[in-house]
């Protein structure tokens, strides 16, 4: 059975970098997918679906539920390793509920943990506006993305806390201790 870890955090929390470094350090056992990267790759392909996705991403809004869930399910099925890390998901209560439903209807993938990389809005803003990744990294879009992230957050955290799947990592430190703590946490959860 595949073991799935979801990494959530504000824009600029470092969740994608953290997950990527963990997977790179153990590539034979861990696969990392970023919903943002999967969606941006579709946009870059120039497909009709990509154009639809771009109309949402460029404004900092959520991509429709069916598109995101299909993208993630395809990625999980294609994963070459037992352990899978997906970052940036779920981003809404609807995504969470739909994903929970999809996972409960199969027996190949087990959600082992939802790891929140916690940072203040101030640190998140500093990081996002300093990274110049693309058109979706300006102040107006940042505040919209932050609002999109924080509005459903309490309900998402409550849901996973009740399932005893929610874990917190302090994301305001340098990358090395964050990644080390996350690796340790994943190993600990897998041994339970």
UniProtKB/Swiss-Prot annotation:
Keywords: ATP-binding, Cytoplasm, Kinase, Nucleotide biosynthesis, Nucleotide-binding, Transferase. One of its GO terms (biological process) is AMP salvage. It catalyses: AMP + ATP = 2 ADP. Residues 130-136 are annotated as: LID. The keyword Protein transport does not apply. Residues 34-63 are annotated as: NMP. Catalyzes the reversible transfer of the terminal phosphate group between ATP and AMP. Plays an important role in cellular energy homeostasis and in adenine nucleotide metabolism. Monomer. NCBIfam families: PRK00279.2-2. Consists of three domains, a large central CORE domain and two small peripheral domains, NMPbind and LID, which undergo movements during catalysis. The LID domain closes over the site of phosphoryl transfer upon ATP binding. Assembling and dissambling the active center during each catalytic cycle provides an effective means to prevent ATP hydrolysis. This is Adenylate kinase. It comes from Campylobacter jejuni subsp. jejuni serotype O:23/36 (strain 81-176).
């Amino acid at each position: 059975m595949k073991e799935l870890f979801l990494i959530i955090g504000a824009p600029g929390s470092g969740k994608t970098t953290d997950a990527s470094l963990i997977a790179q350090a153990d590539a034979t056992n861990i696969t990392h997918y970023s919903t943002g990267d999967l969606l941006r790759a579709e946009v870059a392909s120039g497909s009709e679906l990509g154009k639809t996705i771009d109309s949402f991403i460029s404004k900092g809004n959520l991509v429709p539920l069916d598109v995101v869930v299909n993208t993630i399910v395809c990625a999980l099925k294609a994963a070459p390793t037992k352990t899978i890390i997906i970052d940036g998901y779920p981003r809404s209560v609807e995504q969470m509920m739909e994903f929970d439903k999809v996972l409960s209807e199969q027996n190949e993938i087990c959600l082992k943990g939802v790891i929140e990389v916690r940072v203040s809005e101030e640190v998140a803003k500093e990081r996002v506006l300093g990274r110049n990744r693309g058109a979706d990294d300006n102040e107006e879009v940042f505040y919209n993305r932050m609002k999109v992230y924080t509005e459903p957050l309490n309900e998402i955290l409550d849901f996973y806390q009740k399932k005893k799947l929610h874990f917190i990592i302090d994301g305001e430190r340098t990358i090395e201790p964050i990644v080390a703590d996350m690796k340790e946490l994943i190993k600990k959860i897998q041994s339970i």
